[in-house]
Structures are given as structure tokens and as C-alpha cells.
């Protein structure tokens, strides 16, 4: 059964290049942060000049561009807010994504015609909250990641005349929809001001502690007691409760000790798995969710391209009434990730949300190794700008907006027209044989991995 309704595919844009790849692979819209006022102050290419370029390019393609203004501002940020926002408003973005009621009030007073989308940072978790923000004049609410599909359905039923947006892919925060103080506490970098250092991903050590005469937790001086967190299996509610107290340290700051406790649920460590909800696109489409959002403004252009391609197909299939293509789940395994979870869309045990073993992203399926430049040599071979090492004889996938092909590398030339057996890494260029009728614009190259992973891609 086909449906006229098709959700918007909303991709992250940490740079103009990421935006262009997202659009090429099927995104309907992108979001990017305003300087000083978004939660991605670090790794944000978008100054006012680039925002103008991005918004104009998006509109020329019939796409949309949303500007994120979602910090929790202190008084000092209010002094220049309207003055700083005026040039952005003049660029005519399609909406502002905002969380702070005070900033929203100022925008409504000064720029009444701009659409405002409520940021996930505002933690909208019930239909009454959504209805309130509709009455305040907002046109879309980005629902909290902590909601189940049934709760989303009830919100849709109770407030049918406002747009809803849901995160379907990307990193999850161990705090409630990102409202975290961990980085501020440990590293003096306030996540709510856009300077999160991802302290929840760091590697920590645990050692047994003891309590002193006044009840403070202090080190138990016995180096033999020191253990690695990753070697301790979590109890996850099944182990016996312990009255032991612990101290933990981050590997880069061994002299700074923090306290930890264990209860019937285990010791709480903070590394969430990544969200992957492509299998729920059909259901979310049927519910009338207007926008399906991919997290990742600090991710690579390859990530933007691959996620856009996968979720584009899932949305198109759902709108056409086609059954879910389970191979899309496997395709997303090719991206480096911290383990996948469905998040809170369905209820799971604790270990299905958390990764207790490592904090880095990894894939054992593929590694992104090259970007096609669009050029061909006199023999018609396509040029690749190498990003990671690959070898003659490797099996690779070539990804393009028109479709993907797999092949084995049987010949490579360098720019001197010399035969080479290795593309050595970033900064090198090689030529490969690919079909002449393939459009090389936005084409990417991935190496298929066998019995290895992206942490040690050439270990076998």
C-alpha cells in the first residue's frame, strides 16, 4: 500500500562539504549551528559567510537549511544575541532550532515571521508540552530521544496539527537528551555552551576505595587491587549487591580520582551505544512523523553520504508500501560505530543501551579509503584521492548517488602513470578501472574488511 506522506530526511552539516554530500545522497534538509549559539562550537565550519553559501545552495536545489541556536545561554550571551542573529535571519534560513524559552521569546518579539523548531535539548516528552509549544507559535517539536514508539504515537494523536521530528541515527548521550554536566565537571568544558569534550567516552580505571572517619571515600592503598573497567563484567541487575566503594580515574588524568558506587544494577559507566532506527522508519512514517533526523555534525562527509543513502531508501520504500529491506541494517554496519541500539523506541535491558567495552567507533565490515576526484586519465581510469591505505587485490565498494558497485582492484596507476600495488594513505592519488558510464560526482570508495577492523585494518 502506497502513501502520499513521506517524512523529510534531515542530515547533519558540520561543513559545506558534508552538506553537499548529504544532499547528493538524498537528504531533503540539513541543519548547522550558528556561531556562538549552538551546541557544536567546536568543529563547526559555519561562520556567517558559510551559512549564507549553505542556505543559498540548499534553496537552489529545492532543499531546506535549518540553523541551530540551542545553547543554554547565560546573561552575557543575551547582550548581543539579537544583533548577532539579525544577519542570519537576513539569509532566510527555513527555521531556527531553539531550546531556551528566553531566546525563543526574544526571537518571537524581534523576528515574528521566522519558523522555530523546538530543540531536543528542551526535553519534550509528553503531548501537553508539545501542545504548549504549539500555542507559543512553534511549527515543529523535536521529541526527546527517551520516548518509545507508543509514546510518540500518543503525542501524534493528541496534537495532530504540529510537525514532529525524531532522531533515527547517531550518537546517544548518557545524559537526558544531551543536558549533561559531566564534561563541565571533569574538564571545565560546559556541554550546554557547546564545548562538550565527550568525557563519557573516555577510558576509566577503577580501584577499590574505603571510607575515612568522616565518611569521605579515599584510596585504599593497595596497588594490587587496581583493575581495568573493561575487564569487569557489569552485573546488570543480576549480581549481588556490594557495600564496596570505588574510586575511578580517566587514563589521561591518573592523579584525579572520583568516587563510584555499585548497587543492584551494577556500577554506572557512561558510554552509550549508537542509535540505529532504520528498521522503524516504516512505523514512524505510518505515524505521520514529519522529519527523521540523523545526528552527526562532527562526523565525516562519508558518514553523511552513507547515512543519507540508507535512510533515503528506507523512507522511499516505506512511502511506496514496500517491505523493509533488512540489508540496510547490514549496510550501516560498514560505518564505524560503538555498537548499535534501537534506543528507547522499544524497551530493552541495560546492556542493550550501553557499551561497557570501549568508547571509540569501530567497524569490522568496511573502511572508507578514498574519494573520487571526478577526473579520468588518458586510459579512462578514474582518479581517487586516497584517505586510508588500500592494496592491489582488495575487494572494494564504490558508492555513488546513482547506486553502488563492488569489484576487486586488479590494476592501479599513480599520477606518473606507473603501476603501483598500494595506495599508501592520505595525500596520495591513484587511478582505478571503473565503468565509463558511472558518474564520478560524489563517488566514494570503501575497502571491504575480512577478519579485521578499522582499528587495525591491515592486521591480517
UniProtKB/Swiss-Prot annotation:
Instruction: Give the enzyme's main class according to its UniProt record, as a single word.
Output: hydrolase
What is the protein's known function? Involved in prephenate-dependent formation of 5-hydroxyuridine (ho5U) modification at position 34 in tRNAs, the first step in 5-carboxymethoxyuridine (cmo5U) biosynthesis.
Cited InterPro entries: Peptidase_U32, Peptidase_U32_C, RNA/ubiquinone_mod_enzymes
Q: Enumerate the PANTHER family for this protein.
A: PEPTIDASE U32 FAMILY (PTHR30217), TRNA HYDROXYLATION PROTEIN P (PTHR30217:SF6)
Q: What is this protein called?
A: tRNA hydroxylation protein P
Q: Which keywords belong to this entry?
A: Hydrolase, Protease, tRNA processing
| Keyword Cytoplasm among record annotations | no
Q: Which NCBIfam families match?
A: PRK15452.1 (NF011996)
Q: Name one GO cellular component term.
A: cytosol
Q: Name one GO molecular function term.
A: peptidase activity
Q: Which domain of life is it from?
A: Bacteria
The EC number(s) attached to this protein equal: 3.4.-.-
